[in-house]
A protein has these predicted regions:
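Tubulin/FtsZ superfamily GTPase core signature
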Residues: 1-171
């Protein structure tokens, strides 16, 4: 599908995504938060690695419960990806229960992510059980407006991860 048709069909894609999110959300609040973050991903410009509506729909196409996380750290700290992945791990919890993972990294244009920095992320993703039907979709966007984010009174540039995880419903 070309870009023109993709954009024209976006409202239909969003409605399908909204239905999927509603089905796996534990509450209306989680559903709304997830949709707000998904819209940020879909509408992000200057993406280095793109997540499109089809990627989002595929990652949400499973049974379970949706966990929504928006994690932000100072983009100037040493080992920033290690710190960010550590924060994600704290929020997600037990990797064995994660069936599907969608995450999008936002980084300041003036402090771009280097390939060499992504090793902690790669190590973390490899910790998921490969014999399961685990799905992962990810993207990255450079942004020039990162000091405006919530709870950022110091106006420092931020490294941010939007993480949507579908976890198993074990009783």
């Amino acid at each position: 599908m070309d870009r023109e048709h993709y954009i024209k069909d976006m409202p239909e894609h969003i409605e399908k995504i909204r239905a999927q999110v509603a089905r796996i959300s534990a509450s209306e609040e989680i559903c709304q938060q997830a949709m707000q973050l998904i819209m940020e991903i879909v509408e992000s410009s200057n993406s280095v690695v793109i997540i499109d509506a089809n990627d989002i729909r595929d990652s949400l196409d499973c049974d379970g419960t949706l966990a929504v996380n928006d994690i932000r750290i100072n983009a100037k700290v040493h080992d920033r990806m290690k710190e960010l992945v550590g924060q994600i791990e704290k929020k997600i919890g037990n990797n064995a229960t994660v069936k599907s993972l969608l995450f999008h990294l936002f980084f300041p244009e003036e402090l771009p992510l280097q390939m060499s920095e992504l090793q902690p992320l790669s190590d973390w993703l490899s910790s998921f059980q490969s014999e399961t039907d685990f799905k992962v979709r990810w993207g990255m966007t450079a942004t020039s407006h990162f000091s405006h984010s919530l709870n950022n009174t110091s106006q420092e540039p931020l490294l941010r991860a939007i993480v949507l995880a579908v976890t198993c419903n074990y009783q």
